[in-house]
Amino acid sequence: MITIQDCLTLSADKLPQLNALFESEYRPAAEQRGMSLIETRLSPPLPLQREAVNLWLRWQVTDVGAWWGMRAMAGTPEVAAFWQKVDALCESRERFYPQDLQQLELVAAQDTAAFQVQTRGHRETAQLALREGISDADVKALRDALNRAAELPGVEAVSVAENLAPEYAAGHYTFDLLFDSRASADAARASQIWTQHIAPALDQHCCAVHAQAMDTIGAGLRAAELSGAIKRTAFFRLLPGTDRDRAQRFEADLLEMPAQIPQILNWRLSRAEPLPWHRSDDAPWTYVWEQEFASLDDLLGPYMTHPHHWSHIDRWFDPESGIQAVDARLSHAFSPLSESLITREAVRGE
């Protein structure tokens, strides 16, 4: 069982209104999402006149799979509207995931300092969304054009990979380019290969191109010889009004993931900057978070089920957590990786 603990701080005179709101607009739908209400407690156990009180709601879901199912159903307008009403009544709220310490197998985080690297050159990554109804022949034409990126001046590495579950991503393909410098990338976009082959193919066959330049925040390399693997490319955007302190806390939490989850072999967190060939009506992305895994099982198994992921990191994305700072509309792309891109750009520190 997984325990979910909501703590809501509010004036005692608003408790009846809040309880009625939960019973009428949240609890029935929560039960349909697999959440069972176990108990409701108040601390201190009396209505204070001059101070707020804390209302504690304890829920349970059966397991991690049920938890992810519950989270997948949280991003509805009805859930968002409910929590807006709650926020109007409360001074603060936060969701926690306390578990029975006696039943936990606590595993110390790994020290990843020896694996940390800097990056060189200039890398660009893009999510390519195909036009609806595109034919197999047109997909092949697009891939052929993208593969010609290997002929661009100054390019050092090119990867064109089909996303395995594009419904979770901003595109059907992940397109990566490594140049020796930003100046080389700019020159490449003026070259004949780009202007006469790649750019026209993108315009013709893609309804959106989420193309980002990457400015490294932190990177690490556990498996330099990694090949025949899986690359996860995630795009995130901070919510409007998120201050720098909260952004840095989010970044630090992401960069702790490899220490907690050893299946993340190589990683790179970068600030995102839209490129001249970016084409999308969506709000700009803030981050690119790349992870390289030995296998798809490592991504879908230990990575998704690790408590550091679902009980800690996910709260930054969850509108029910009370601490959300990242838009839940993220891009989660994962695709085959022939060889490590992070290895190609890594520079070991002195």
Q: Can you name each region flagged by the protein language model?
A:
Residues 1-80, 84-196, 200-311, 326-350:
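Short S/T/G/P-rich N-terminal loop/turn motif that feeds into the first structured element of a domain
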